[in-house]
Structures are given as C-alpha cells and as structure tokens.
Amino acid sequence: MRRKILCLIFVLKIRCKFYKTIFQLYQYYNKINAKLQSIKDKQKIERTTLRQKRITRKRNNRINDYLSKAARTIVNYCLNNDIGKLVLGYNEDFQRNSNIGSINNQNFVNIPYGKLRDKLIYLCKLYGIEFKLQEESYTSKASFFDGDEIPIYDKENLQEYIFSGKRIKRGLYQTSTGKLINADCNGALNILRKSKVVDLRVLYNRGELNTPKRIRVV
C-alpha cells in the first residue's frame, strides 16, 4: 500500500522550466503567424490560409507531445517512488481575472493548464494513484514553517491578511525566524497542507524541503 505523498505545483513564472518551454513554443509560432497575417492583410485575404492551419496544427501537436511527456514523467516518478497520492494546485480565476501586466496576461492565457490536468487525471486513474485538485489561493504568501492560517480567496471579502513570512527576492521565501526556503517549495507545501491529505508534522525537519529537485522532461 502506497503511503507517500507527492505535492505537485507548477508556479506560473517565466523562470519555471515547464512554462518557459510552453512560452517559447507559443512565441515562436505566434511570431510566424503574425508575419503570415501581415501578408494576408496586405493582400486583403480574410480566410485562414492553409499555411496558417499547418503551423497551428504543428504547434498544437508539439505542445500536446510535451504535456504528455510531462504528465508521464510525473506519474512514472510516483510509481517508481511508491507514491500513492498526487495533489495538484489550481486557481479557477488565474486566467480569467489575472491583472499582472499585458505580457504576463498573454502568457497566462497561453498556458494549457487544463490539458495537463486532464492527462494527469487519466494516468492517475489508470495506475491507481489518488488524484486531488486543491484550491491554492494565498499558498505562495503564507509561511509553511510558521504554520500560517491559509484562507480561501473570496472577491467579496475585502479583508487583508498578514502572514508571518515574505518573499525576499525571486524564488526565495523567508520565514519569521529568518529561515530561507525555495519559494516554490513553500507554496507546494502549503497546497499540500491545505489539501489535508496527510499529517505534515513529519516533514518540518526534512532538509530536502528547502530546495526542489529539477527533473528534465524532454
């Protein structure tokens, strides 16, 4: 019987390898499509050309291939390490209502989060791994090691929450005692804490929580 837990979080930042790859694919094909669109405009062509359809199909195939490999890598890691539960953080409004600048908003819209989620759900069901989606609001702001209470975001609630720790620079989170932890790990642990799928007291003194392990997908 599997007893270990894997908490998975994909932080939507350019520096994150997974999303950087997706961004690059979209940017490359969008650049080509923009040139084709410019030619169409000059020639007053309104329909989608065969070349546009071809590059769109190629882009979608490449992204789907990458997502499939990413999902397979995650599930294989679970199987190889006797992990029986997978927790995936999500935010229902992270695309619809995000207001973080025009460039970042474009990147958020391009992220095929739902496709990755669906692939993980399918593979987890296939191999008997328990899969749970967990709402993740405030998990990047709260301090895991300080045990901050993590509220659920409500747009009707105007209350401002104060947390023990803070992000002091890109990728690094500082607790109230000055302990430094990788910001992505802090967020992932808070998602796991919010999910309540396991007692996390045994994790507080685990050294590997401070720094994440990077796994190459392709």
Model-predicted segments: where are they?
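Positively charged, helix-rich recognition surfaces that bind polyanionic ligands
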Residues: R2-V218
